[in-house]
UniProtKB/Swiss-Prot annotation:
Biological role: Aspartyl protease inhibitor.
GO cellular component terms attached to this protein's record: extracellular region
Subcellular location, principal: secreted
Location in the cell: Secreted
Stretches the record annotates as Disordered: 200-222
Annotated protein name in UniProt: Pepsin inhibitor Dit33
Pfam families in the record: Pepsin-I3
Compositional bias annotation for Polar residues: 204-219
Record organism: Dirofilaria immitis (Canine heartworm)
Residue pairs linked by disulfide bridges in the UniProt entry: 135-230
Superkingdom of origin: Eukaryota
Signal sequence residues: 1-17
Keywords: Aspartic protease inhibitor, Disulfide bond, Protease inhibitor, Secreted, Signal
GO molecular function, one term: aspartic-type endopeptidase inhibitor activity
Amino acid sequence: MKILFCFVLLAIAALRASVINRHNKRFAGFSVAGIGGTAGCVVVDNKLFANSFYLRDLTTEEQRELAQYVEDSNQYKEEVKTSLEERRKGWQLARHGEKDAKVLSSLAEKKFPKPPKKPSFCSAGDTTQYYFDGCMVQNNKIYVGRMYVRDLTSDEINQLKTFDAKMTAYQKYLSSSIQQQVDSLFGDKSNLFNLFTDTRHETSSQPSDATTISTTTQAPVEPPETPHFCIAIY
């Protein structure tokens, strides 16, 4: 049961990370609604690409910004490596009973280092892709496959902004609904550490009152209507 619960939590964590922390792909195609991955920004010889599409050459100031980002990224990678090593050693000691529950709980809740801020030339507007039936929109430009078609009109840009806001709200609603269903089944055990310590200490701990799970339900959020930038024939 605990193994199953662990997988459920990992799935929810991945979904939350996608919905809240990433500017990725927005899908509104035939029988599709969700979020996928993205290559983001890539710079080669000071040429800027977004999701493999060439945008422009970097300015001198942007090149300096890129150099600082590379330096910060290298430092971030070292901090993450150190943090993971601390956790690995902590869990190894826990397996041999050399650390108590409070110390391990503190270790599990310790925050990971924050990644460096993206350069200003790699914004959500540059990298977000909107997939519709038959075409894709990126940076307010319509593509069919990899072929550029045209820029969006002012009215179409407003339609896209409205769609993005509604799709984001819909995806957050889905994530919240899944979390509520898991909580109703297993209770609020969002800390993975508890999965492996509850059984060890349950014989010495005093019985506690059952956790009351909130039965409040959100008003359903419907998926937004898809903008008609292109027409696919099936």
